[in-house]
Amino acid sequence: MCASPSTAPGFFNPRPQSGAELSAFDIGLSRSMGLGVPPHSAWHEPPASLGGHLHAASAGPGTTTGSVATGGGGTTPSSVASQQSAVIKQDLSCPSLNQAGSGHHPGIKEDLSSSLPSANGGSAGGHHSGSGSGSGSGVNPGHGSDMLPLIKGHGQDMLTSIKGQPTGCGSTTPSSQANSSHSQSSNSGSQIDSKQNIECVVCGDKSSGKHYGQFTCEGCKSFFKRSVRRNLTYSCRGSRNCPIDQHHRNQCQYCRLKKCLKMGMRREAVQRGRVPPTQPGLAGMHGQYQIANGDPMGIAGFNGHSYLSSYISLLLRAEPYPTSRYGQCMQPNNIMGIDNICELAARLLFSAVEWAKNIPFFPELQVTDQVALLRLVWSELFVLNASQCSMPLHVAPLLAAAGLHASPMAADRVVAFMDHIRIFQEQVEKLKALHVDSAEYSCLKAIVLFTTGKLLDILYKDVPALLTKVSALLGKGSTASNDDVLAVVRDHLDELNRQEQESQAQQQAPLHLAAFMNCVAGVEAAVQQAEQAQVPTSSASASVSAPLVPSAGSAFSSCQAKSAGSEMDLLASLYAQAQATPPSSGGGDASGHNNSSGLGASLPTQSQSGSSSRNLTASPLSTSLATAPAPASASAPAPVPTSSVAQVPVPAPVPVTSSASSSSLGGGAYQTPSAAAAAAAMFHYQTPPRAAFGSAFDMFHHSTPFGVGVGHAHALAHSSGSGSASFGSPSYRYSPYSLAGSRWQL
């Protein structure tokens, strides 16, 4: 509609003209001429038959209204079209802008040179009147009147923009603006193309932009941000030179983070996580609320809800990714194949480990403790994660997908597998029926991870290995000092006592203590021999040469500290008993009570009030001490009561003469350091009755007690001629439902 050189042959007009944005393509330049000034040869004189068409088009709208007078000189609608074609003025010789435009335009050059407004606003009116008189007969007046308001608006706007620019041969024209805008758009387009082709400096994948100082992909960007925000530390299983590319970037996190830093990604560019202003940080909360006596609810002004909410928010923030990222497991009615289930199970396990590494206080533990905790609770965490993501489990599709019906697996294994799947499915369905939300799942997982019993189990499993090592060192005649070796055991037992005392406040100590008591048989055997040596026996026993390994287990974990006065007597007695003939192991005392469970006389001790740093005074197991029968011994003194623990009557130590040393015990030389180890441990701990730990021995009554030779155990079992031997069938049990006052009964 607008007159421009694009109507002439040889030009390409991709779309209709508009007065808003102009580019080289809009004004009719060919594509090869869009980036520079067209040469002189690009223009040609149109045929004579086209001259009238161009003139009529230029002057068409102007024939109805004549010239339009403005404040700075005249402008006409024909000048609108001529301004759009003013880009080719740069190719022409710079004409004088003060001369008046002629009324006739024999060619394109005259039309362009005479259409520009002069600096003093002179010649636009003359140009319009001349062009109007030359070609007014061929124009429809109605068309011009309809387009008058639109053309007037465009003409006024363009006049204002042109008036603001200095005119002349060196002036800025719309052509230069159009060329500059086109070049900018071309440069931006080339930048976008080049950005899309840039590879990630870390793994070589397609870059999504510049992140933290370097062009990286989204995966490396997220990995670097997560590592910096959470202060994560990694370890390399190789030589710290693992290949990091698109296919191996997830195999070694240490080398990946190392390469991120090497390529120039900046830690300081990562924004740290912000705590909302309404919720103070945990550090400030710890300083604000000073917990007294371990009871946070007793603090004045303490808001337990806000305090716990802050921890819950931290647990939720530690989630590696929302449950919607688990994929198709979120679809309740979807039946998954065995491959997808295996992949999802691995993903759930990895997410549990990732979650545990980011929750409060867990990273502060040692790496060995972290691994031990996760090994203990991974199954519970897996069930909670599977229920949280609504993992669909159906036994029949699982078996069909796994091909168990055609597998060579034995029938009993298939049945066991079915039982495991069924139990797992029942647990998941029960949790799903409760409609547990994300916060509750996070709290449940934290409770499972930080259960006190799990921490004690770790220590309990370490003690037998430690004691075995100590026994090996002492048995081989190591040059190391026995006191130094036993100090390690004593420190470990002190730590167990501390943990045990803390757990008793939560009413969980008996079960954990019972589980730990499976390794006390060695020391109890030595102590029992010392006790039975002082009780008159009616039958002689056969000599057994089986060695006795000192096993200072949890026999001392709930015991009272002894005074220093009885140490020498106990040491002398144990040294003598290590070389003496084993006494009769009939297991009975004068009163007919079975002494195999440790309910007889204890070792000599002097109760010391106030020395309860290692004593578990609040233990419910102490009630079993009050009911323990004392042996019928004339030398037994009266019981010494204490304010915290009921003591068992004990006999006085019987000095052993040197003739006892000439007994026929084959392993006497070996048992001397063993007896010393047991004696040194017994200086600080008093052996509790074995009846208090019956459930542990019920679990292991088919196996030989820890630290006692097989031959020695069988000899003790057969020498009495009855079923109540020392290490035969146990005569104690744990009754959790007893109403007799003590849950531990004979």
Swiss-Prot record:
Low complexity bias spans: 56-68, 171-191, 606-645
An example Gene Ontology CC term for this record: cytoplasm
Keywords: DNA-binding, Metal-binding, Nucleus, Receptor, Sensory transduction, Transcription, Transcription regulation, Vision, Zinc, Zinc-finger
Gene (name only): svp
Region: Disordered, residue numbers: 38-191, 579-645
Localization terms from the record: Nucleus
Tissue specificity remark: Expressed in several embryonic tissues; dorsal vessel, oenocyte and fat body. CNS expression is dynamic and confined to temporally restricted subsections of the NB lineage; expressed in many NB and GMCs, but only a small number of neurons.
Protein family per UniProt: Belongs to the nuclear hormone receptor family. NR2 subfamily.
Protein name: Steroid receptor seven-up, isoform A
Role of this protein: Receptor that is required in photoreceptors R1, R3, R4 and R6 during eye development; generation of the ganglion mother cell-2 (GMC-2) fate in the nb7-3 lineage, coinciding with the transition in the expression of HB to KR in the neuroblasts (NBs).
Chain intervals annotated as zinc finger (NR C4-type): 200-220, 236-260
Segments of skewed composition (Gly residues): 122-141
Source organism per UniProt: Drosophila melanogaster (Fruit fly)
UniProt-listed GO biological process terms: cardioblast cell fate determination; cell differentiation; epithelial cell proliferation involved in Malpighian tubule morphogenesis; fat body development; glial cell development; glucose homeostasis; heart development; lipid homeostasis
Domain NR LBD positions: 307-556
Predominant location: nucleus
Any GO molecular function: nuclear receptor activity
Comp. bias (Polar residues): 83-101, 158-170, 592-605
